[in-house]
Design a protein with these regions (language model features):
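Structural preference for solvent-exposed beta-strand-turn elements
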Residues: 1-396
């Protein structure tokens, strides 16, 4: 095999694949990537850990068809260090690969292509959503997925499209993140109900982050397929049933306090410094016009801060794991900012265009029933997405 490719193109595609390549594995070939020719003007790059596979197609000048299989990490490190010029690859005898870029020359040890696993093909009729919407779903739910390997049915996200609505739900048993959006046009006829593993979600977010097009997806009995602008991610499906999350969605939280997201986030960060390291407990006392936060450690002391809030009702103390609060506030802040990121363009009249970012304060609605029932948080006045975060309180 022999081909030439732009350094920037190769660096980008190798960067996407690094997340799924195994660095420490009992199957040595999984530390490698496969590069194959596709006609005269394109190559295909594949990396896998057998659970998640990423396949990228890239423009290249193919002088001789064939394939090479070399260390994913070593190749990526070399390509990142090269100048922004064309990179030339040539396969030699005994699987060795010579690569040149400018005055730099390298020889890499390769392995036989036959050792590399076969990749499932994407045969099902694909459904599609805007990649920005899918990425939005992932960014604001993935943090609530459990890290406990034994709870495999919770180690991913439930993704549903039905009745003209797209929905994603995650939980670790202590908290739950829920987001949905109404679909329009041809999207309304789509239908899917599946579990997407956590690793696949995180890799999808990287691929979809700066993409302006659609993401096509489908499934077979064992795999999920996601395709975005020439890049295909394949994931093994999770077996088992996701819990009935609707049972924990609060139906009668008739008390609500509304506060500024940034003010609360800063207060939680400060007060949590005095929380007990074992329980991570922080206490919120909701009263007329304010929410008081306090945390204490028997060995180190205590911290207290008051955040203004729109609230009229009974004084109610509620305990939380401060990390659960902060993760929601961090993600809701990113979510709100990206929603508002459609900045207005203003002309000065002489052809000069300046961009004005009109970000306003983001408000959070904190909805509860009493000290013991689950609390629901959401972005107030958000009409585009229905985003809810439900947390079980701690005993205080």
């Amino acid at each position: 095999m022999e081909f030439t490719i732009k350094q920037s193109t190769l660096k980008d595609e190798l960067g996407f694949i690094q997340g799924v390549v195994e660095r420490k594995t009992t199957i040595p070939v999984l530390a490698n990537i496969l590069i194959e020719s596709l006609g005269d003007n394109e190559i295909r790059i594949v990396g896998t850990d057998l659970d998640v596979t990423i396949r990228c197609d890239a423009e290249a000048v193919v002088e001789k068809a064939g394939s090479i299989c070399v260390s994913a990490r070593k190749l990526f490190d070399i390509v990142r260090a090269l100048d922004a010029e064309d990179v030339h690859f040539k396969k030699d005898d005994n699987e060795w690969v010579t690569m040149k870029c400018g005055r730099a020359k390298f020889r890499l040890a390769g392995v036989n292509r036959e050792q590399f696993p076969e990749i499932p093909s994407f045969k099902s009729t694909p459904l599609s959503l805007p990649a920005a919407t899918f990425n939005y779903f992932i960014q604001n739910t993935a943090f609530a997925i459990t890290n406990e390997v034994s709870r495999f049915t919770l180690s991913g996200a439930k993704f549903v499209i039905a009745d003209g609505i797209a929905r994603m739900v995650t939980t670790d048993g202590h908290r739950l993140a829920f987001i949905e959006q109404k679909l329009s046009g041809d999207e309304k006829t789509s239908a899917i109900d599946t579990l997407i593993p956590r690793k696949a979600l995180l890799e999808l977010a990287k691929i979809a982050r700066d993409t302006g097009g659609d993401i096509a997806f489908g499934e077979d009995q064992k795999h999920l397929f996601f395709e975005i602008e020439g890049r295909l991610l394949i994931s093994r499906t999770l077996t088992g049933s996701f819990p009935n999350y609707e049972l924990v969605m609060p139906k009668d939280n008739d008390l609500a306090a509304v506060f500024d997201l940034e003010e609360m986030r800063a207060a939680v960060r400060r007060v949590s410094l005095m929380a007990d390291d074992r329980t991570r407990s922080i206490r919120l006392i909701v009263r007329d016009g304010e929410i008081e936060l306090n945390a204490q450690s028997s060995e180190e002391g205590e911290g207290r801060e008051v955040v203004p809030a729109e609230y009229t009702g009974p004084e109610t103390p509620i305990g939380f794991n401060w990390q659960y609060l902060l993760e929601f506030l961090n993600n809701a802040g990113s979510m709100a900012n990206s929603t508002k990121a459609e900045a207005e363009k203003e002309s000065d009249g002489d052809g000069t265009v300046r961009v004005r970012d009109g970000n306003a304060a983001t408000r959070i609605s904190f909805e509860f029933k009493d000290s013991n029932a689950q609390t629901q948080m959401r972005i107030a006045d958000n009409s585009e997405y229905d985003y809810k975060y439900i947390v079980m309180p701690l005993r205080i």
